[in-house]
Amino acid sequence: REEKFLAKGLSNIKSTLEEGVSRRIFTTERVTEILGKISPTTDLSRLVNCQLIIEAVFEDLNVKNGLFRHISSIVPEDTILASNTSSFSISELARAVSHPERFLGLHFFFHAAKNRLVEIVKGDKTSEQVFDNMMQFMQRIGKDPIVCKDAHGFVVNRFFVPWLNEAVRIYEEGIADIAAIETAACRTFGCSMGPFALMNATGIPIAYHAQKTLYEVYGAFYKPADKLLQQMNSKSPWEIKPEQIIDWDVYLQVSERLSAVTMLVCGQILDKNICTAGDITRGAGIGLKWRKTPVNIFNRLGQDRVIELVQPLLQKWDMTIPRKMDTNSWIPDYISVEKQDNVGVLTFNRPEGLNAINPMVIDQLEKG
């Protein structure tokens, strides 16, 4: 059975590369070269000479722990080990790793071969050298890394998965049908795929289990929608009808609900210093391909309107408003300043906008 999985994996890789040839991203020779560097195997002992090993098995804590214990017993103590988990604590997983200072989280995004975003997550015992090496390595292979604290859901999934779940709740409550929710979501966040299309593409079980993990850690607000569980159990995709003309009142309800949930969760992220507002923008812009990120929406609506939008959620789920729902906390860090001897170095960090200059960048340049 394992050999079939290897064959399927290689076939998927080959299809992606051939698509790259058709789009003139790769030459046929380059594809042959890449495929020649891939050595599929079910024999873990062949990992003994690897310098970096990234685990990407399904989200089962016992399976991951067992795998890391096995790998730790095979490879040298300086081999860097990483998990692609999107649900579990890196510090918890590190308990299964000998020499946990060499362990960290490297969370890639769908489609990993095309998506530039990667979340880099330090565990309690991750060494600075391992962290720095992985930052440099990710940049060298063309990724745009964001750094986040070790918290369930990290950055992007912490707000993206509740966005999916809230879309199902809206459908469940009869406020709008799936087609209308898709239309409103795409217009509000500037994305090409709405929540239901994305769940169909990446797997409804993945959305459900990710939301369930958040619920178990963070409480009632994160409870998976009943229809999400039902749809997963049906083993069928969501039925999405063609885009339709949407009633304006319905559009506003859907848009405001999805915006409120997203900004509330991002406020919680900022409260815990899991990342910066700039990292949220980079995560949404690069990882999710949202042209209108939560930070963009917050700054467009303004602090008072955002607080007004999240009030119904706070009342319904008996929550307090995050402390960092103020304008200053939602300014993305586009410019970093560093002094090297007598030279000042300004670094642009706005890859989601191709490092283009906008009024906020100009303001930060002047202050820098």
Model-derived features with residue positions:
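N-terminal glycine-rich phosphate-binding loop for ADP-containing cofactors
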Residues: 1-342, 349-352
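A short, well-ordered alpha-helical element
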Residues: 357-368
